[in-house]
Amino acid sequence: MADDFVPGLEGVIAFETTIAEPDKDGGSLRYRGVDIEDLVGKITFGNVWALLVDGKFGPGLPPAEPFPIPVHSGDVRVDVQAALAMLAPFWGYRPLLDISDDEARDQLARAAVMALSYVAQSARGIGNPAVPQSRVDEAATIVERFMVRWRGEPDPRHVAAVDAYWTSAAEHGMNAST
């Protein structure tokens, strides 16, 4: 066996990215050069989304449009996939090759928040009435809107926990373990 043989994928670079940068020792993670410790609990997920997608802080995710979920199968994944597929032709989305980068970004943001809205609506369950849009509109962040749409009156600690989780998991990246 050769002296330079290393089993597995140790040392193999599959690709390079500027979006997420874990340190080699696993002690820290940076999104676009910003340490995750400076984001979690300090910057809302909607604005972290802007950092990841746009490369800078700015207008994050817009509020979802008040479309009720049109499918209730009892399976959140099925409901969301079916509902999102209905929006593209309704909104007139065209193939990515036929639109500008700015239009693609706006469409991605619009679809992303609708996915969150549909997850919340489906997870709320068929037997529970929808939360009034006026209540959803009182929420200050994308995560709070999600939680209100799902739970009605969420515990602020739960909103903070979900926001922290979504921020920390927003860019998993692709590493040898995946």
Task: List each language-model region with its residue ranges.
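Hydrophobic alpha-helical bundle cores within soluble ligand-binding/oligomerization subdomains
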Residues: 1-178
